[in-house]
């Protein structure tokens, strides 16, 4: 079963707290990809604390130029160079010139056969990308349509490849379970106000990692003016995107803990299932 591991290395906003560092999330999938979403100050040490070398990262995806999301990047670049590696960094196009001077490989998308990640524009105060990850998890076959087929053919069909049995060519679509989705999606927003135009472009996702800078003590208009969201905004986004799982992060240092965020989230009947993790918490998400 496809499982994605998320380790929350920093769940805070612009100002760190002793138990809530600046934004950074480590993602590892069942295919072996290791992705760092944002690179807040001190993230290199946090990676080492969970046993991950910077040089082992498949790529780093930063959402925008604000310091709380990128101050950990120079250290990662330097360490990777010492270890003989060259980091791949995904970022908004407005950041490419500055990042290329660090000697990293810069782009705004990355693609392999079963894994894609691309920038989707969000609604912040500067040019900013949310990162949409797509996995090809293969087809789930309808057993009533595959009776009698050899095992090798089933394996190829699950991978999405047609097979030839005698004179007949069978495509995966012919024998697939229509209730099963071949592609699974995770969206990490970074900093954003409510962004209906982005929701329309994306369509739907399985997992949404959305900022919730504010609980309910700041007016929505004030939060949106600053390019941020409230808990209610994040829940609205999850429902607009049909997300089954919502993970709230980027919690302002104005809150001594996340109890108010959790209280607001507890009023919602799933879906989405809402998680408000602490730093160093690991989430295993089944796609």
Curated annotation (Swiss-Prot):
Enzyme Commission designation: 3.1.26.11
Keyword Transport recorded: no
Required cofactor names: Zn(2+)
Gene Ontology MF terms: 3'-tRNA processing endoribonuclease activity; zinc ion binding
Active-site feature positions: 68 (proton acceptor)
Keywords recorded for this protein, A-Z: Endonuclease, Hydrolase, Metal-binding, Nuclease, tRNA processing, Zinc
Residues that bind Zn(2+) 2: 68-69, 191, 250
Annotated binding of Zn(2+) 1, by residue: 64, 66, 124, 191
InterPro entries: Metallo-B-lactamas (IPR001279), RibonucZ/Hydroxyglut_hydro (IPR036866), RNase_Z/BN (IPR013471)
One Pfam family here: Lactamase_B_2
Stated role: Zinc phosphodiesterase, which displays some tRNA 3'-processing endonuclease activity. Probably involved in tRNA maturation, by removing a 3'-trailer from precursor tRNA.
Entry similarity comment: Belongs to the RNase Z family.
Quaternary structure annotation from Swiss-Prot or TrEMBL: Homodimer.
Protein name: Ribonuclease Z
Protein species of origin: Pyrobaculum aerophilum (strain ATCC 51768 / DSM 7523 / JCM 9630 / CIP 104966 / NBRC 100827 / IM2)
């Amino acid at each position: 079963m496809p499982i994605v591991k998320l380790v929350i290395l920093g769940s805070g906003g612009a100002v760190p707290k002793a138990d809530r560092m600046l934004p950074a999330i480590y993602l590892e999938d069942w295919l072996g990809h290791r992705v760092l979403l944002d690179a807040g100050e001190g993230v290199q040490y946090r990676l080492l604390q969970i046993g991950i070398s910077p040089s082992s990262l498949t790529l780093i995806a930063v959402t925008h130029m604000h310091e709380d999301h990128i101050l950990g990047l120079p250290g990662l670049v330097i360490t990777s160079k010492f270890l003989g590696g060259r980091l791949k960094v995904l970022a908004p196009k407005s950041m490419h010139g500055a990042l290329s001077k660090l000697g990293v490989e810069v782009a705004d998308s990355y693609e392999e056969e079963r894994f894609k990640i691309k920038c989707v524009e969000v609604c912040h105060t500067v040019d900013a990308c949310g990162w949409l990850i797509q996995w090809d998890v293969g087809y789930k076959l309808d057993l009533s349509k595959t009776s009698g087929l050899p095992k090798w053919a089933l394996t190829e069909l699950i991978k999405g490849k047609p097979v030839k049995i005698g004179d007949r060519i069978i495509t995966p679509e012919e024998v697939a379970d229509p209730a099963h989705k071949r592609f699974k999606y995770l969206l990490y927003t970074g900093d954003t106000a409510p962004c209906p135009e982005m929701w329309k472009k994306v369509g739907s996702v399985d997992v949404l990692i959305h900022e919730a800078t504010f609980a309910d003590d700041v007016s929505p208009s004030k939060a949106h003016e600053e390019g941020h969201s409230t808990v209610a905004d994040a829940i609205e986004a999850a429902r607009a995107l049909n997300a089954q799982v919502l993970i709230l992060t980027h919690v302002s240092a104005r809150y001594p803990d996340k109890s108010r965020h959790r209280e607001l989230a507890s009023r919602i009947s799933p879906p989405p299932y809402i998680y408000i993790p602490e730093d160093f918490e690991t989430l295993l998400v089944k796609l």
